[in-house]
Amino acid sequence: MPVDFNGYWKMLSNENFEEYLRALDVNVALRKIANLLKPDKEIVQDGDHMIIRTLSTFRNYIMDFQVGKEFEEDLTGIDDRKCMTTVSWDGDKLQCVQKGEKEGRGWTQWIEGDELHLEMRAEGVICKQVFKKVH
């Protein structure tokens, strides 16, 4: 049985986010705005089908996928690229590989207690975010 990621999560910390955005070639103005945001995550999980909504006052991003199946991810509004994305289970963690222009791009997501941990990677840069479950 997979881990239950269902819930609404509020950001607690966001380490190295601006460097991560720089590695994705996000322009300086957008990096500065994005770095000020504290987005929430709303996750709806039905077995291996997931919808992850990243919600902020500036922009929302919705990722709708089936674990284990590759899909084309449109990152318009983030770094305006498309990539082929696969999310898979690695024990109790979700591992995402995003194949495209940027080397080593992807993320890992897991739960510790009532906290959601998200580690995003691109071009050797790692950003660590932590969210607390609110419901």
UniProtKB/Swiss-Prot annotation:
**UniProt binding sites for all-trans-retinol:** 41, 63, 109
Q: What happens when the gene is disrupted?
A: No visible phenotype when mice are kept on a vitamin A-enriched diet. Still, mutant mice have impaired vitamin A homeostasis. Four week old mice have reduced levels of retinoids in the liver, due to more rapid vitamin A turnover. When mice are kept on a vitamin A-deficient diet after weaning, they gain weight normally during the first 5 weeks, and then stop gaining weight.
Query: A Pfam family for this UniProt protein?
Result: Lipocalin
Q: GO terms for CC?
A: cytosol; lipid droplet; nucleoplasm
Q: Which UniProt keywords apply?
A: Cytoplasm, Lipid droplet, Retinol-binding, Transport, Vitamin A
Region of interest (Important for interaction with STRA6), residue spans: 22-32
Q: Where in the cell is it found?
A: Cytoplasm; Lipid droplet
Q: What does this protein do?
A: Cytoplasmic retinol-binding protein. Accepts retinol from the transport protein STRA6, and thereby contributes to retinol uptake, storage and retinoid homeostasis.
Record's domain comment? Forms a beta-barrel structure that accommodates hydrophobic ligands in its interior.
Known partners and oligomeric status = Interacts (only as retinol-free apoprotein) with STRA6.
Name of the protein: Retinol-binding protein 1
**Per the UniProt entry, what species is this protein from, by scientific name?**
Mus musculus (Mouse)
- Quote the gene name from the UniProt entry: Rbp1
